[in-house]
Amino acid sequence: MRFGRKPAALLLLLSMLLAGCTSGSVDRLYCLPKRSEAHRDLQLAIDAAMGGMEYSAPRSGENLQAVQVRDLDGDGKGEYLLFAKKAGDRPLQILIFRPTADGYALSETIETYGTAFDRVEYANIDGKPGYELIVGRRLSDQVIRAVSVYSFAEGQSALLTTDNYTHFTTCDLDGDGNGELLVFKHGEAAEQTGVAVYYSYRDGIMERSAEVSMSAPTENVKRILVGWLADNRMAVFVASTVEENAIVTDVFSVVDGKFTNLTLSGEAGNGVGMVRNYYVYADDIDNDGVTELPELISMRPLSESESPGDSQYLIRWYALRSDGTREQKLYTYHNYESGWYISIQSDWAQRLTIVQDGTSYGVYLWNADNTESEKLLTVYAFSGQDRETQAVSGNRFLLYEGDTVQYAAELEVAAVRYGVTKDRLIRNFHLIQQDWKTGET
C-alpha cells in the first residue's frame, strides 16, 4: 500500500475482477469478467498457463481474490497476479501476466514453499515507481508461516527479505513516505511474550531492527491497527488478551531513528479490562486523526445495595506522544450490549452514575460533595414491533433510527440546569461501529 488514499480507478478495477462469473465449478468462481476483448485475451492466457494447477486465493487480509491487479514495475500499466497451487516440492505459484501488443502474456512465475497463501499486501517499500509484493504463506497445517517481500523495480521479481511470522502489517513508522514491514513472531521460548521486528529499505537492502518485546504472546493478539500518535507520528497499535479478561495494547513506533514499544518505555499503563464482556480497543474515538487508547473508570453506585456485577464504567480516552507521555482527550459511556455510546464532559466524569433497567439507562449526576444525586435523563433502546411509537411516546425524542432498533431519550427537569438539551444529546450520541475484519465492536 501507499500511505495515502488509493486511486479510485484502481479500487473500481479491483472490485470488478471477480464480477460477472457464472455458476459452475469452484475454479469458475475465480474467473475474470467477460467484459472486453482485453479481458478475453487475459482469460485465454490464464487458461493456457493453468495446466495442472488450481486457484489458491489468500486466506486472510483485505486482498482475498485469486486474481489481483497492481502496477508492480511502475510503468503505469497494471500487472495481473494469479495465486495458484500445484503438486510438487514448491506447490505455491504466483503467475504474473503483463499486457502485450497482442493481449496478455505470462511473464513470470514465482514458485515457493507452503500449503496455502495466508495474506497478501502491496506497498511502495523501495521508493521506486511501482509496488512491492508482500506474501504471507502457511508452511504447514500448524501455525508456522513465512512472509516474503518481492520487488519488481527492474522488471522481474527480486526477493528482498523473508522471515517467519504470526502476524504482519505494513506501515510508514519513520515518516519517509515509503512502506515498511512490521512482523510479529514468537519469542525464543513458547511461554515467552512475542517479539516485533521492523524491516525498512536502506541502501538497496531490507534492514532488520533488533527484536522488541511485546506484552503478551503472539497467539493472544486480537487486533492490529495502524494509526497516529498525538505528535503526528505513525504508530502500530497491537491489542492482545491477558489473563482472559483484559486487553493490553502495545504501541510501536520509530523514535529518534530507533524502533521501540512506547508502552514498555513510557508512562502508559496500557491494560484495560472488559466492559460487560466486550473488549475495548484503541480507536480514533473523536475523529481527529489521532488514535486514542481506553482506560476504564468505575462509576459510583447509586446505592450501597448494588452488587459489583451491576457496576457501570466510563472510558477515559487518551493519546500517546512519541516520548510515551499521555494527552487526555475525552470521556465516553459505551453500552456495548445495545450498540451505542455517548460523549461525557470531563468535569462530570467523577460525579456520574448510570443505572440499567432492562434496555433503558438512567443517567444521574452527583452534587459537588457527593451527598445527593439528580436524574438528568434516560436513554432507551426499543426493538419491538411498536418501537417507532415507543420512541416518541410522552416526552421522549428520537436519538437514532436503525433498521431494527429505535434509540430514544427523555430529559428530566434537572437537565436544564446543567445545560443538557435535546440537540446536545443528539450530537453526543453515537453508534458503536463493528470492525468489518473481525466482526467485533
Regions found by a protein language model. Give the residues of each.
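A short acidic/glycine-rich loop-to-helix N-cap element
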Residues: V413-R424
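Sec-dependent bacterial lipoprotein signal peptides
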Residues: M1-A19
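Beta-propeller-forming repeat regions
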Residues: C21-Q356, G362-L365, D386-G402, Q406-A408, ...
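A short acidic-to-branched-hydrophobic micro-motif
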Residues: D369-D386
